[in-house]
Amino acid sequence: MKVVHTVGKRRTAIARATAKEGSGKIRINKKPLELMEPKYIKMKLMEPVILAGEALSNIDVDIDVKGGGIVSQMDATRTALGKAIVEFTGKMELKEKFLSYDRTLLVSDARRTEPHKPSKSSKGPRAKRQKSYR
């Protein structure tokens, strides 16, 4: 039995996906993809599923996601799901399809929040006092 493990990251959210042979079920934190709320999040998570089409009919994917907020978790989950589908099927045309549609389906976003600097630490990383000329 073939099993594939992949990881997707976005800011502080980390999604770990496990793909194995099955009947096309996708579960996120043990909850079916169809029951995800709000609708915007569900639609974004359906993108790799719609693009994959029939390639997903014999794959079960279980995703555990932790950390971050709801949108970061969604992005991390999309990346983990896209990577799992491509790695499990091994089809280059599917990989090209994902990359041409949206690169973040296969590549994690490396950006992180900038650390606050000393002195005006509570105000943010680049806060300066406003200068007055009069």
Swiss-Prot record:
Keyword flag Ribosomal protein: yes
GO CC entries: cytosolic small ribosomal subunit
Region annotated Disordered, chain positions: 109-134
Biased composition range(s): Basic residues: 118-134
Gene Ontology BP term (one): maturation of SSU-rRNA from tricistronic rRNA transcript (SSU-rRNA, 5.8S rRNA, LSU-rRNA)
GO molecular function: RNA binding; structural constituent of ribosome
Keywords: Ribonucleoprotein, Ribosomal protein
The UniProt record lists the keyword DNA damage: no
InterPro entries (alphabetical): Ribosomal_Su5_D2-typ_SF, Ribosomal_uS9, Ribosomal_uS9_archaeal, Ribosomal_uS9_CS, Ribsml_uS5_D2-typ_fold_subgr
Sequence similarity: Belongs to the universal ribosomal protein uS9 family.
Protein name per the record: Small ribosomal subunit protein uS9
Species per Swiss-Prot/TrEMBL record: Methanococcus maripaludis (strain C7 / ATCC BAA-1331)
